[in-house]
Amino acid sequence: MIKCSILLLAFLVAVTLSYSQHSVRFVISALPLTNSNNSNLFVAGSFNGWNPQDKNYHFQKNEQGSYSLGIKLADGAYEFKITRGGWDKVECKKGGANIQNRFLKLSSDTTIDLMVEEWADNIERKPRVSTAGKNVRIIDTAFLIPQLNRTRRVSIYLPSDYSATKKRYPVLYMQDGQNVFDDLTSFAGEWSVDETMDSIGNHTREMIVVAVDHGGDKRINEYCPYDMEKYGKGEGNKYIDFLVKTLKPFIDKSYRTEKNKKNTFIAGSSMGGLISMYAILKYPRVFGGAGVFSPAFWIGPEIFNDIAAKGAKVNSKIYFYCGAQEGETMQPDTEKAFSEMRKISKSTMVCVVRADGKHSEWVWKEEFPLFYLWLMEK
C-alpha cells in the first residue's frame, strides 16, 4: 500500500509539472507599411533575458503574410516587446513614441494577436547624445577577456575629487555596462550611476565604478555559470575569473583603489544579478559586497546548490532587490536566496521587495542610490 501511494504521488507530481508549462502562440497580424517582406522578427521579454535577437524566439512567416511563434512558458506574469533584431529596431507607436512593455498573465494555453504600429528605426529622430558625465571615461573599447578570447568595452567613473587628492577608493564592478552611465549606449534606459555618485557621493564615502559592457548575443552565456538546455554552455565561471584575475589587477594597478575585500563590490540586474550572486559565492575573499537586482535565478536554478555548498564561507554585505510585478517566480526565488543565505552565512544582508517594481532599468536606477548608501554604511 505504501509503495502504491508513493508511485501515485510521483505520478501526480509528474502530471502537475507537465501541466505547469503552457503553449503560447504569438501571432503578428498587422505590420507597418514600411515593413520589409524579408523582415526577421523576434520577441524579447522577461522570459528570455530581453534578448532582442534570440534565435529561439524567432517568428516564422506563413503563406498569408502573418508571422507566428510558438513557445512554452510556465504560469506567471511576463513582459515583452517585438523587435527586428535589435533595440534600435524595436516596435513603437506610429508617431515614434515608445510603448510600454506588453504584458502577459499566463495560466493556460493561449494565443496572443499582435499589431505593430511602427519600428523605431523608421522614425526620423534627433540624434541621441551622450549623457555620460565628465567623470566617466572609457578605459578601452576592446579590453581583452583572455578567459573567453573576446574583447569588451570597459568604462570607469572616478570620484569628483580623484585628481585633486591622493585618496584611495573602494571599487564597484557593474555588469551591462552599456546601461550604467550613458543613455546613448543603453538599450533600455540608463541607471545614471555617475549622476548618483556626483550628487550623493559627498554625503558618504565616494567610490570608483567600473562598468563592463555585456557581450550582446553572448550575454546570457557569459552571465550564467551553468550549462543551459535552451541557451547552451554557461560561461559565467570564466567571466568571473576575468573580473577577478584580469580586470581587477589592471584596475588596482592603474588607479588608486582600496584593493582589499572590504572595499571591492559587484552588482548587476537580471542576468547580471545572477552572475553577481555567483561571484560572491565563488570568490568570498575578493568581494565584500554585492547588489543582486532582480536576479534571473530561473535561468540558473543551480545557484541554490551553490548557496547551500558555499554560502557558509561568505561573510559580506549583500543587497537583494526585486519587484513584485516581475512574474510569479522572481520574488519567491529572490526571497529564497536571501532566506537560505541567512541560515548559513554571517553576511549582513537586506532583501527589498518593491510592490510596484517591474523588470526595468528605470526601477533599478531608482533603487541604486539606496543600495549605494546601504553599502557604504559602517
What are the roles of these predicted feature ranges?
Residues I99-R102, S107-Y169:
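A domain-start/cap signature at the N-terminus of enzymes
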Residues K167-G177:
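Short beta-strand element of the alpha/beta-hydrolase
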Residues M1-V24:
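Bacterial Sec-dependent N-terminal signal peptides
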Residues Q178-I240:
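Active-site machinery of serine-nucleophile hydrolases
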Residues Y321, E326-K378:
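C-terminal catalytic histidine-bearing segment of alpha/beta-hydrolase fold enzymes
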Residues S23-R25, P32-D75, G85-L106, D140:
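Aromatic-rich carbohydrate-binding modules that target alpha-glucans
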Residues P225-F265:
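Gly/Ser-rich "nucleophile elbow"/oxyanion-hole loop immediately N-terminal to the catalytic nucleophile
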Residues N260-D306, K310:
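Primarily recognizes the serine-hydrolase "nucleophile elbow" in alpha/beta-hydrolase
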